[in-house]
A protein has these predicted regions:
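Substrate/ligand-engaging "lid" and interaction regions
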Residues: 1-272
């Protein structure tokens, strides 16, 4: 059976707008799935690059399938049991922050980039005072993000229209506030200039988010039968439940530039009051 690939999906090339730290099942069946629908509805027009933020693990399955994969949602919809299949084509590439550091770092220079999504587990948003700017990359997620943002700030000479929007989905309260605090501490630790700290405050947006969807992951016991049903081999299938909710709290209004609700998606925006 032929492996799922871009030729089979007819993937449309779009500008890379999202860098996503994490390539796990939840992000692929939630964020990437929603962006795929928003692209289809003509509301977003942007691709995602996945970043493997840890040293171990492999991206071979992603490269083999050119980052194309199927999401199957299963559950009760309008009182009826349903299975909804969707081939997700919103992911353009997957990069290893350790094994392909330069390729990863070069995305900081990408003009079209606007959003940083992350799911680095509940323990991922932590301040690590052993991180250093010269590390390629720093160990912690906030360390990687701080260096990435600093490289972008330098490349674009502090241009205020080149800031990024952070959309962390780690399951901790006030995830965006905690993430920004870590970044600010690292900027002080690394003696980064005041102009960068101003750019963080004025050009960048750190949202806090609340997410809800049960994602059951790769259906190991059913994968062979599902691939027969699909008519292609897919080693990246993700299963989950139809219900989803994404609440985005932001001190700056990003609803017009990231209009997922306009695509009929279960996303809502609220105003975030910063401490």
């Amino acid at each position: 059976m032929e492996l799922l690939n871009r030729k089979k999906t007819g993937k449309v090339e779009r500008p890379v707008k999202v860098l996503q730290f994490g390539e796990g099942n939840f992000l692929r069946a939630f964020v990437d799935y929603m962006i795929d629908i928003a692209n289809e509805q003509g509301k977003f027009n942007g691709d995602i690059v996945l970043v493997k933020p840890i040293e171990f693990g492999s991206l071979d399955r992603f490269h083999d399938q050119e980052c194309q994969y199927t999401v199957q949602l299963r559950g009760i919809v309008d009182g009826e049991p349903k299975r909804i299949n969707r081939i997700v084509t919103s992911v353009a590439d997957a990069v290893d922050a350790y094994g392909e550091y330069q390729k990863y770092a070069d995305y900081a220079k990408l003009d079209s980039l606007r959003y940083i999504v992350s799911n680095t587990t509940e323990a991922g948003i932590v301040y690590d005072d052993t991180d250093r700017l010269e590390m390629e990359p720093p160990k912690s997620y906030p360390g990687k993000l701080t260096k990435f943002l600093y490289e972008r700030y330098k490349h674009f000479n502090g241009a205020m229209d080149k800031g990024l929007v952070m959309l962390p989905v780690e399951l901790i309260d006030d995830n965006g506030i905690h993430l920004k605090e870590c970044v600010e501490k690292l900027a002080v630790l690394w003696n980064l200039e005041d102009g960068f700290k101003t750019w963080l405050d004025e050009a960048c947006v750190f949202t806090s988010t609340l997410v809800d969807r049960i994602v059951t992951g790769y259906p190991r016991d059913e994968a062979e039968e599902l691939c027969k049903e699909f008519g292609y081999q897919d080693n990246l299938i993700v299963t989950g439940e139809p219900f989803a909710l994404w609440v985005i709290e932001s001190a700056k209004d990003i609803s017009k530039e990231f209009p997922l609700p306009d695509a009929g998606l279960p996303v809502s925006y609220t105003h975030l009051t910063l401490p």
